[in-house]
Amino acid sequence: RPNPCPGILGHEIIGKIEQLGDEVRNDLRGNPLSLNDRITWTEYFYSGQSYYRDIHDMPQKSPGVRKYGHDLVEEDPHFLGGFAEYCYILPGTGILKLPDAITDEEATPLNCGVATMISITEASKINMGDTVVVQGLGLLGLYGCAIAKARGARLVIGLDSVKERLSIAERFGAD
């Protein structure tokens, strides 16, 4: 994916609503949005029709999709990266209001790392009672362990050459 320069990096973003557009009323789940609500949003924005959006429910793969943290700062709107003080959220972006029980640190990876592993575990069709092997227990592997266990895997086997990661993986559901 191109990463034009100069740009404002950052695509796993948490923020507070400073201003709402006239047509923005609710988040992805239908929760009402208000000023100062703590939110996160999809790392991409795409509002047109496309084969990927309409057939596969994957608008992020559509031709012409734009992604936060991957745009020129010189193009309007200028604030499209998470490292900016403010970020302009464009139409076609999914917004999710965060509950107080989830910290910023816990919520930050939801749009990329966790979403990636949810997609992988769904495609793998993990069922209740299955045995799952997760090779590599870095951040994505840890999410994979937790999600596989939450989906009903009876046994989650974590593999990694770094010994310390094995004990960490146990806290994420690896057996």
Regions found by a protein language model. Give the residues of each.
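Glycine-rich beta-strand-centered segment in the early N-terminal region that forms part
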Residues: R1-D54, P99-A101
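Glycine-centered flexibility sites
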Residues: G10, G15, G21, N36, ...
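ATP/adenylate-binding site constellation spanning eukaryotic-like Ser/Thr protein kinases
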Residues: G10, I55, G92, G113-V114, ...
